[in-house]
């Protein structure tokens, strides 16, 4: 099985990837590296695994959805 990786807002533009499928990853950081081809992670990126906030060192498994998005700001 595979892992679905999504990028939102400005991260979509920076990575050039909206959504991709990777074969495997051990952590969310590993999923970032594989989905972006090793692009450095910008500061303050948020990650969610299966719609729940997580850290970059959180484990991922086959069938998971990993989403990356910039911090939410408002005013």
Q: What are these regions, as identified by a protein language model?
A:
Residues 1-74:
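Ubiquitin-like/PB1-type beta-grasp interaction modules and other compact soluble beta-rich domains
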């Amino acid at each position: 099985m595979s892992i679905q990786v999504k990028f939102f807002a400005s991260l979509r533009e920076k990575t050039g990837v909206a959504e991709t499928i990777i074969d495997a990853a051990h952590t969310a950081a590993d999923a970032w590296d594989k989905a972006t081809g090793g692009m450095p992670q910008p500061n303050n990126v948020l990650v969610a695994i299966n719609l729940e906030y997580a850290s970059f060192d959180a484990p991922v498994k086959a069938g998971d959805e990993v989403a990356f998005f910039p911090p939410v700001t408002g005013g």
